[in-house]
């Protein structure tokens, strides 16, 4: 099976390792390399976010170079804190959100779609502080504080074809992407190896999808679906493959080709999570007890027939309140109820994200719930909020799948972790 070992920086020359320096930018045919603003501008495929790390510069920096790679005996790195400070000096004012960071992005070609184990090593003579590691299409793999010395972390990612935003056809994807964010993000060594194991496929709308991240990055000002934070709550026995997209319904998910990708790659023993409702409710033919219910039934039956395990997720609650009396306005309760009914009918788990998210909004109130949503938005979470919602989903997996008569569901509950602790907006 496929395996590649990389050593970064000035300590090259070791047998069976591919030496990587700060000048090694990703190019077609090379098979690996860093992704910066320079080669992203030069290569069209690097501009399609779903085929890459999903990080890109804020639009007003699109013609500028922000990533200045360096190397030393401990690896390759960039001085994110200094580059952000330079941008602030240039503009004459600090950026909102603190601290903002520039990601160190590395890309590796792999021979086929599937699951890959990534082992990342960082060696630093100074405190690293807060570090975020994302894999694939900006899926959170690690969040924590790292001190001086050597830090090694192992994670799993899924590589799968996708229908990108703005396209009507399926694009093949055979690359592993890693993005490291810190004041001085660094990679010292990296191993990418093919592994077998179950995959959790996600089918949903904008509240689930892998949203892009602008940089200099701040988690409070990025749209983020809970699906891209879900890997933070699984161990390395299971991978997540997210095919959710903004604007999709139980109907358009099939008609626009997204379900075809899942049908092609899912195998017996895998899982498919379905969370819809936000867009179904806008269409007369997809009301809760009509087309919405019928479409979910069809998805359930099709997956059960091929040995894939369906799971329903009730739609995340909006932060919506009535102006006249300041009472909560629940726009999705009927859709959540249908999920619960179908779960009972077919004996499958229903993860009641609607109940958890509604409880959070009710406890916080309109204003205090806002920090976990994208600024000015009452439906879509930012990275903080998506991490919280993914935590609720993980909690539900533990509670609803543990002890299930189908061993595969119980196994999934065993793969759930506690994540990386609280990750809250400042002041929350």
Please annotate each region the language model reported:
Residues 146-147, 207, 247, 317, ...:
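Residue-level detector of flexible, active-site-proximal loop/helix-junction positions
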Residues 135, 204, 244, 276, ...:
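Glycine-rich, histidine-containing beta strand-loop boundary motifs that form or position
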Residues 257-387, 391-411, 415-418, 422-427:
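Alpha-helical cap/lid subdomain in secreted, periplasmic
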Residues 135-136, 234-236, 306, 346:
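Short, structured coil segments at secondary-structure junctions
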Residues 5, 240-242, 347-350:
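Conserved beta-strand scaffold positions in the cores of enzyme catalytic domains, especially
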Residues 101-104, 251, 255-259:
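N-terminal post-signal-peptidase region of extra-cytosolic proteins
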Residues 1-213, 222-224:
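Compositionally biased, intrinsically disordered or flexible polar/acidic segments
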Residues 33-41, 46, 194-256, 265-272, ...:
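Conserved, compact domain cores that house catalytic/ligand-binding motifs in diverse enzymes
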């Amino acid at each position: 099976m496929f395996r590649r070992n990389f050593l970064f920086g000035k300590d090259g020359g070791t047998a069976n390792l591919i030496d990587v320096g700060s000048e090694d930018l990703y190019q077609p045919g090379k098979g690996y390399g860093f992704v910066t603003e320079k080669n992203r501008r030069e290569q069209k495929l690097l501009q399609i976010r779903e085929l890459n790390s999903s990080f890109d510069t804020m639009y007003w920096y699109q013609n500028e170079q922000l990533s200045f790679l360096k190397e030393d005996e401990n690896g390759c790195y960039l001085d994110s804190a200094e580059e952000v400070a330079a941008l602030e000096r240039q503009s004459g004012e600090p950026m909102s959100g603190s601290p903002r960071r520039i990601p160190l992005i590395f890309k590796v070609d792999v021979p086929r779609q599937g699951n890959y184990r990534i082992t990342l090593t960082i060696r630093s003579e100074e405190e690293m502080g807060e570090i975020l590691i994302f894999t694939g299409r900006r899926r959170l793999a690690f969040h924590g504080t790292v001190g001086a010395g050597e830090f090694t972390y192992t994670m799993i990612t899924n590589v799968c074809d996708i229908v990108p935003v703005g396209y009507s056809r399926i694009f093949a994807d055979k690359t592993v992407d890693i993005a490291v964010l810190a004041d001085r993000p660094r990679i010292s060594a990296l191993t990418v190896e093919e592994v077998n194991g179950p995959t959790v496929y996600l089918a949903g709308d904008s509240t689930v999808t892998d949203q892009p991240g602008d940089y200099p990055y701040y988690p409070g000002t990025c749209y983020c679906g809970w699906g891209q934070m879900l890997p933070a709550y699984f161990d390395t026995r299971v991978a997540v493959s997210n095919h959710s997209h903004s604007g999709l319904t139980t109907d358009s998910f099939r008609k626009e080709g997204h379900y075809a990708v899942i049908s092609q790659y899912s195998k017996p023993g895998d899982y498919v999570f379905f969370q819809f409702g936000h867009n179904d409710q806008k269409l007369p033919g997809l009301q809760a007890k009509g087309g919405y219910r019928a479409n979910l039934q069809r998805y359930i039956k099709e997956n059960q027939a091929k040995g894939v395990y369906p799971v329903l997720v009730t739609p995340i609650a909006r932060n919506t309140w009535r102006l006249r009396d300041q009472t909560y306005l629940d726009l999705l309760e009927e859709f959540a109820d249908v999920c619960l009914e179908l779960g009972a009918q077919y004996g499958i788990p229903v993860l009641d994200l609607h109940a958890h998210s509604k409880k959070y909004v009710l406890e916080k109130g309109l204003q205090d719930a806002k920090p976990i949503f994208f600024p000015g938005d009452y439906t879509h979470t930012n990275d903080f909020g998506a991490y919280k919602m993914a935590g609720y989903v993980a909690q539900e997996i533990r509670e609803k799948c543990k002890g299930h008569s189908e061993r595969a569901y119980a196994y999934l509950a065993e793969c759930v972790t506690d994540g990386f602790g609280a990750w809250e907006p400042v002041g929350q």
